[in-house]
Amino acid sequence: MTIIPSFHHFIYVFLFVMPIVFNGPVSDAAPPSVTVTEILQRTFKRVPGDKSGDAAIYPDQRHLWCNHSVGTPTVDFDGKTWRMWFVGMSMTDNPEIPYGFAARLGLATSNDGIHWNIANEGQPILDFGSPGKFDDVGLSHPFVLRVDDHYMMWYGGIDGRTGKDVGVGPAHVRVEQIGLAISRDGVTWHRENNGNPVLSIGPQDSIDAVQVTGCHVIRKDNRFVMWYGAYNGTHTIGLATSSDGVHWHKENEGRSLRGLMGGKQLGPSVYFDGNQYLMFYNTTRPTPNGGSQWTLYSATSSDGIKWQPANHNKPLLDEAPEGNFGSADGQTGNNHAVHPTKMIFIEDAIRMGYGAEENKPSKGRRYPAGAIGLMELRIGR
């Protein structure tokens, strides 16, 4: 099968005998008592941003490190300031960097969660790791959790190896492993675990022989639970647990989650209301032109392992309106809506960020540009 290059390929989550039981995240501001059932009774709508194509963040030539594409956002709101960490990409001729795109992590801030500006004087907040480290040629897929007085960021590290080097999957697909960095202000970060991965790829017969990346983490009773993207030639979602966020154990006997739609899944975002889990995730769907799109679907679970498709098996978002940055048609652009952030609860609404891409390359670009958008659901309680 021919794999069509897309923004997803460039930037693309515990089990003991008892089921997982949480009372909800205790990191970040605790969400209001909103049930999964209430959320599923309502519909997410796009929130127009103030950048090109109604994006919230769009690649900008003023910031050379992210002038081709931005994506895989992760958002935090402390009641005053919105912060969004994201992947920024620029083209490179360095043969050691897979796909020809250099990927770094940046930060944008906002007062209202709609109008965003790149922070840190327009520079990345986390750049390539030291030579020989697991992230020495790129970074991807950040997920940030506010814990007490600091931020914890798990992210994908790229060391230049591909499927060819590990003997699994398509030869060109890059290896990714998860690292951890800590920050007090969200700008200055310190790599933990001596700059080594905290969750590594598995053996050749595992679900994550090529990639462990693109995660969502919940903290409860001094335990972290991670749903993460696993890849061994097929994208699936796995689980891991940790007492400190550094030392992780892959759960469910290293197997993928069950019951999700499609033959491949990635990009999990998980919410727990005290009784039921809700996951937003990506799988592919065919398009009328014979291509395929990665788009957002939802599922529910009573234990976080076995899932049932929700929303009548329909995507979360309708087709993008004309002129919208998320106009990928399944051929020249594959990402309709991908890698959703966690849900942010604001008054009578829930807001999320997501990535998408255009349906054709714009001037000076080899591939369609990826950008970040917003969607919102009105609770109306």
Each language-model region and where it sits:
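Bacterial N-terminal signal peptides
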Residues: 11-21
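Generic signature of intrinsically disordered, low-complexity, basic-rich segments
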Residues: 13, 25-26, 104
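Short intrinsically disordered, low-complexity segments
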Residues: 6, 21-22, 353
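Signal peptide processing junction and immediate N-terminal pro/mature segment
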Residues: 21-30
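Carbohydrate-active catalytic/glycan-binding domains of CAZyme proteins
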Residues: 30-381
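Bacterial N-terminal signal peptides that target proteins for export
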Residues: 2-12
